[in-house]
């Protein structure tokens, strides 16, 4: 994976038919002063997973995040993190996706996003 998410170490596992899955190894440098996984890292994971899911369905155009709601359920710790995403509704100009981040089988984050399909 290239760009910002790739620089963090995010690894795409699958992205097809409106579904995506990512893996991420959280390390000490990803923690906040409280010693838990920084919320910005978790937001990046859900946005990236939903973007991959959205792109897997967009035949013509590029989905761009227009709204993102992130609900933090519990803190993350160093270790393997998994993010999964799914396109829930697809229209001509907008897509709605949701995503979940898990660690050791426990939900850390639930997110919902709207993507605008940008055509060039």
Go through the PLM ranges and name each one:
Residues 1-23, 28:
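Non-catalytic linker/capping segments at the edges of enzyme domains
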Residues 5-7, 17, 45-49, 63-67, ...:
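Short connector loops at helix/strand junctions that flank enzyme active sites
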Residues 12-13, 62, 87:
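Short secondary-structure boundary/capping segments
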Residues 26-32, 42:
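A short interface-forming secondary-structure element
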Residues 32-35, 120:
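A short, polar/proline- and glycine-enriched secondary-structure boundary/capping micro-motif
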Residues 37-62:
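Active-site helix/loop of acyl-thioester processing domains in fatty-acid/polyketide metabolism
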Residues 59, 74-78, 82-120:
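HotDog/MaoC-like acyl-thioester-processing domains
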